[in-house]
């Protein structure tokens, strides 16, 4: 376990922790407006995570994926990383979130088609399954997109009734 100390505060990053920061700012389908802030959000999150005073993640444990073309490539990369992570696993997404015709959350990639989000985007269910199946002690997802609240409903539905307070 790595510990950083500065200004009297200890920041502890569990061994074998990984963060995946996904930002999608450009789209092939004209129905999606570009989100220039998505790229900047990934850069800001990386700076926050790797700051030794704030979070202290080693830079080699923070992976940026900016403007991925295919959802399958993102999903495969997430699975590969999740399988070897036993510390903390953080997945951050900034981009468009859209709903399928059955109200399932889909995270867009550059090639996502507005009228076919479930088969051209990255479904939240896929990301949730990656998180559930990981042996990481801490699993965290941060979604900066429309319809992010659907992720809570999907987890609640798949894990049974839960008490959410706040």
State where each predicted segment sits.
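Boundary/activation segment at the start of structured domains
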Residues: 1-106
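Caspase-like (clan CD) cysteine peptidase catalytic core
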Residues: 16, 71-157
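Short, intrinsically disordered, charge-balanced linker/junction segments flanking boundaries
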Residues: 160-166
């Amino acid at each position: 376990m790595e510990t950083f100390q500065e200004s009297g505060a200890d920041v502890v990053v569990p061994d074998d922790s990984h963060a995946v920061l996904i930002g999608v700012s450009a789209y092939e389908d004209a129905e999606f407006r570009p989100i220039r802030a998505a790229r900047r959000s990934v850069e800001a999150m990386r700076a926050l995570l790797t700051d030794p005073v704030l979070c202290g993640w080693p830079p080699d444990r923070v992976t940026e994926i900016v403007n991925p073309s295919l959802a399958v490539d993102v999903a495969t990369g997430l699975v590969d990383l999740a399988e070897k992570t036993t510390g903390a696993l953080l997945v951050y997404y900034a981009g468009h979130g859209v709903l399928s015709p059955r109200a399932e959350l889909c995270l867009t990639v550059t090639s996502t088609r507005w009228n076919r989000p479930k088969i051209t985007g990255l479904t939240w269910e896929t990301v949730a399954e990656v998180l559930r199946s990981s042996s990481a002690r801490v699993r965290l997802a941060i979604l900066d997109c429309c319809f992010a609240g659907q992720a809570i409903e999907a987890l609640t539905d798949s894990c049974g009734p839960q008490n959410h307070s706040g």
